[in-house]
UniProtKB/Swiss-Prot annotation:
Its EC number is 2.3.1.225. The gene is PFA5. The DHHC domain is required for palmitoyltransferase activity. Residues 120-170 form the DHHC domain. This is Palmitoyltransferase PFA5. Disulfide bonds: none annotated.
Length: 359
């Protein structure tokens, strides 16, 4: 189980506790005050009361299970990636054996870099950062496709638990919708029954109705936002870096097989929203949720399998395994066009490219 470091704000831990308390109150108020007292006792609709109570409790238990999986699975952790073999390796076999791991890695076709062509390095993890990888201050290590820290659930959302997070939102919406529809559909009869008895309506029922409306608005908007992000193959962090909000440029070191040079090409701020696009919304959804469509709706496990790699592995793709990220084919074509047009920052020879197949 991933645990957030103590340096996180202390009140972060209080928000999930508050959410748990509200969910427990809602479950009790709906099951007892609405289903048992109002529907069963006052309206005499015993079958409906039993059915709604059972359905409600099943969804509540399912929400607890998904929440637990999100925390236990964690967002994923990028394996350590040694520096790319940009210059000839100076260490001999004895020094490499002393390190107990590969001291350099063959560079991929495209990697994020600075203006000189050197890849992004995480000084805390002592590792290169893969594409779309960010260091989490909450967890203290680099997370593949880091999306955000969910203060409501008290954990970081990343590549490995992203699907579970969206399934949690979907189930929470269903939960709120069932409460809203059932209470609204019987509210007039409940109010009429209370007047006939000369009593007030149970305030717990009205509170539960208000909470369901709040959840439908907040979680509904959040779920729609994430559907839109996935359709465009974006994360929350990437969405924040839009030209209007916080424009930024990135550099990519691109291997050109035509002349066997690498070129450092800058991205433009307006391109951040579509550089990972796989060509269609369906392909982008599969990239986030997995290739098996029916698993999109079954909240069990992750679409990212467990994997291990040897410390001596020097192949970048093998090291990252399922955490490997690729630019969209359309954007790669754009980068290659800029190289052909001479619109690049610099070019360089990379020593590791000599070991490519066919060279």
């Amino acid at each position: 189980m991933w645990q957030c470091k103590n340096k996180s704000r202390w009140w972060y831990s209080l928000v999930p506790i508050l959410c748990i308390c509200i969910m427990c109150y809602g479950a009790i108020a709906y099951s007892y005050s609405f289903c048992y007292v109002e529907v069963w006792t006052h309206l005499g609709m015993k079958a409906a009361a039993i059915g709604m109570t059972c359905l409600h409790l099943i969804i509540v238990i399912l929400l607890w299970i998904i929440w637990a999986q999100i925390i236990m699975m964690g967002p994923g952790r990028q394996p350590r990636v040694a520096p790319f073999m940009i210059l000839p390796e100076m260490a001999d076999a004895g020094e490499r054996a002393k390190e107990g791991a590969a001291t350099s890695v063959l560079p991929p076709d495209v990697y994020q870099c600075d203006t000189q062509g050197y890849p992004v390095w995480c000084s805390v993890c002592q590792s290169l950062k893969g594409l779309r990888t960010h260091h989490s201050v909450h967890l203290g290590f680099c997370v593949p496709r880091l999306d955000h820290y969910c203060v409501w659930l008290g954990t970081v959302i990343g590549r490995r638990n992203y699907r579970l997070f969206n399934q949690f939102l979907m189930c929470f919406l269903m939960h709120a919708l069932i409460i809203f529809v059932s209470v609204v559909s019987l509210q007039r009869r409940i109010a009429s029954s209370a007047r006939m008895r000369g009593e007030r309506e149970d305030p717990n029922v009205l509170v539960v109705l208000s909470l369901s409306c709040l959840v439908l608005l907040m979680v509904g908007a959040l779920f729609i936002s994430f559907l839109n992000y996935m359709a465009n193959n974006q994360t929350t962090i990437e969405k924040l870096y839009t030209p209007k909000r916080q424009p930024r440029t990135m550099c990519f070191c691109v291997y050109n097989p035509a002349d066997q040079y690498r070129y450092v090409v800058k991205s433009l701020p307006h391109e951040n929203w579509n550089m990972w696009d796989k060509g269609s919304a369906y392909a982008n959804y599969k990239d986030f949720l997995g290739s098996s469509i029916w698993r999109w709706f079954i909240p069990i496990g992750s679409n990212i399998p467990e994997f291990q790699t040897s410390a001596w592995e020097d192949d970048y793709n093998a090291i990252l395994g399922p955490y490997k990220e690729e630019l969209g084919s359309h954007y790669r074509d754009i980068l290659m066009q800029r190289i052909e047009q001479g619109k690049y920052v610099t070019r360089l020879r990379v020593y590791g490219d000599k070991f490519r197949e066919g060279l």
